Each structure stands twice: as structure tokens, then as C-alpha cells.
């Protein structure tokens, strides 16, 4: 009725093997490529797991900071990553050109290897989600003010980012929207409602 369990069944190595076996047996998305699984679990784009994304070659600072970051983290375990980055940036600036030279040479070698391995490579940075939504909202809520010359486009204040007196048309401040006006503003009716209002003199 009771099963005697061997102490080895709970060792970390056995547990890790059991987890891996379970994952392979029960997951449709499982691949033996660990980096693809890590990307999906850490919020990366899971669609890219089939086609691995090509990383940029490391520059001289990154080559140098790789080992330095490890050293600083071991010496100061309580230090935040952002603080470590600031310290590394300062330390890099303090190095002489002669001290930096081996890292520039290594970066050049890595760039050449990268160019040979990926001849058609072109760096294409991913646009951050927040940045993309801000651009879309600016386009959506931009309108021509009544006193503006034809073609002048002035963005409306969105979420309090523009402060009163800091948006100008023809040298005159544009009246910021009240909370009530902002609620009434929709993409379909925003421009016509705004054109009906005279600008302050």
C-alpha cells in the first residue's frame, strides 16, 4: 500500500530529467533547442522559434564588458544590473585607447566572421510596443487648427503629455483640451468638433 521512495528520486538531477521528459512527452511546442523554449517562456516572440533570429555582432564595449560584468557582479552581489551597467560605462570611458585596442580588434574579427556567416544580414531593430502605439495615437488624433496655414498640423494634447503654453500655431499658443472635450473627441468626429472652436486670441 505504501511505496518506499529512494532518496535519489528527489535529487535535482533526477527532478530536472523528469521535467524534461514530461515536457517532451506532453508539449506540442517542445523542441530540443532550449533557446527557442526560453524565448517563449521569457516573453519573446514564439513565432520566431522556428527561424532563429540572427544577433548583431558584438562591439568592442560588449566584448570588454562581458567579463567585467561577471567580475563586478561577483564582487558586489547586492548591486543592481542598472548600477553595474553605469559603472561599466564609466570604467570603459576611463580606459586609454591602447587598453581598448585589443577589444576593438576582437570586435572587428567578430564582425568579419558574422559577415561571412550571414552575407545578406541587415540590422532591423524591433520597434518597441509603446513607441508604436504613441506614433499611431499621434497620427490618429492630429488635426489642423482653425488659425493654422493650410498644411500645418498640430498634435492635440494626449494623456497630459503636452503642457499648456508649449504647443504653438503661427506663434500663438493652442488652447489645450478640457477633460470634457477630450472625452468627446473620437477619431471620426475629432477634427470637425475641433474646427468649430475658435482659437484663443
UniProtKB/Swiss-Prot annotation:
**Post-translational modification note:** Acetylation of Lys-130 contributes to its nuclear localization and enhances its interaction with KPNB1. Deacetylated by HDAC3.
User: What does the entry give for GO biological process?
Assistant: cell differentiation; male sex determination; sex differentiation
Biased region (Polar residues) positions are: 186-195
Please provide the record's keywords in A-Z order.
Acetylation, Activator, Calmodulin-binding, Cytoplasm, Differentiation, DNA-binding, Nucleus, Repressor, Sexual differentiation, Transcription, Transcription regulation
| Gene3D superfamilies membership | High mobility group box domain
InterPro entries recorded: HMG_box_dom (IPR009071), HMG_box_dom_sf (IPR036910), SRY (IPR017253), SRY-related_HMG-box_TF-like (IPR050140)
Q: Where is this region: Disordered?
A: 162-201
Q: Which GO terms describe its cellular component?
A: cytoplasm; nuclear speck; nucleus
Primary location: nucleus
Task: Give GO MF terms, alphabetically.
Answer: calmodulin binding; DNA-binding transcription activator activity, RNA polymerase II-specific; RNA polymerase II cis-regulatory region sequence-specific DNA binding
* DNA-binding region boundaries: 54-122
Q: Report the PROSITE patterns cross-referenced here.
A: HMG_BOX_2 (PS50118)
Name of one Pfam family that matches: HMG_box
Function (record text)? Transcriptional regulator that controls a genetic switch in male development. It is necessary and sufficient for initiating male sex determination by directing the development of supporting cell precursors (pre-Sertoli cells) as Sertoli rather than granulosa cells. Involved in different aspects of gene regulation including promoter activation or repression. Binds to the DNA consensus sequence 5'-[AT]AACAA[AT]-3'. SRY HMG box recognizes DNA by partial intercalation in the minor groove and promotes DNA bending. Also involved in pre-mRNA splicing.
Similarity comment text for this entry: Belongs to the SRY family.
Matching PANTHER family: SEX-DETERMINING REGION Y PROTEIN, SOX TRANSCRIPTION FACTOR
Q: How does it assemble?
A: Interacts with CALM, EP300, HDAC3, KPNB1, ZNF208 isoform KRAB-O, PARP1, SLC9A3R2 and WT1. The interaction with EP300 modulates its DNA-binding activity. The interaction with KPNB1 is sensitive to dissociation by Ran in the GTP-bound form. Interaction with PARP1 impaired its DNA-binding activity.
**Per its record, how is this protein called by name?**
Sex-determining region Y protein
Amino acid at each position: 500500500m505504501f511505496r518506499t521512495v529512494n532518496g535519489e528520486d528527489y535529487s535535482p538531477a533526477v527532478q530536472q530529467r523528469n521535467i524534461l521528459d514530461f515536457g517532451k512527452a506532453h508539449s506540442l511546442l517542445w523542441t530540443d533547442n532550449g533557446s527557442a523554449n526560453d524565448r517563449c517562456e521569457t516573453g519573446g516572440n514564439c513565432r520566431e522559434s522556428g527561424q532563429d533570429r540572427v544577433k548583431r555582432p558584438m562591439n568592442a564595449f560588449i566584448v570588454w564588458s562581458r567579463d567585467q560584468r561577471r567580475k563586478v557582479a561577483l564582487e558586489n552581489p547586492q548591486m543592481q544590473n542598472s548600477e553595474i551597467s553605469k559603472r561599466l560605462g564609466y570604467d570603459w570611458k576611463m580606459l586609454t585607447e591602447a587598453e581598448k585596442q585589443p577589444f576593438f580588434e576582437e570586435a572587428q574579427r567578430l564582425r568579419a566572421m558574422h559577415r561571412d556567416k550571414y552575407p545578406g544580414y541587415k540590422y532591423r531593430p524591433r520597434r518597441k510596443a509603446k513607441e508604436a502605439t504613441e506614433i499611431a495615437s499621434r497620427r490618429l488624433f492630429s488635426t489642423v487648427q482653425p488659425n493654422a496655414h493650410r498644411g500645418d498640423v498640430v498634435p492635440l494634447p494626449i494623456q497630459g503629455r503636452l503642457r499648456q503654453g508649449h504647443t504653438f500655431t503661427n506663434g500663438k499658443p493652442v488652447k489645450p483640451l478640457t477633460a470634457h472635450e477630450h472625452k468627446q473627441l473620437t477619431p471620426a468626429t475629432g477634427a470637425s468638433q475641433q474646427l468649430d472652436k475658435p482659437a484663443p486670441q
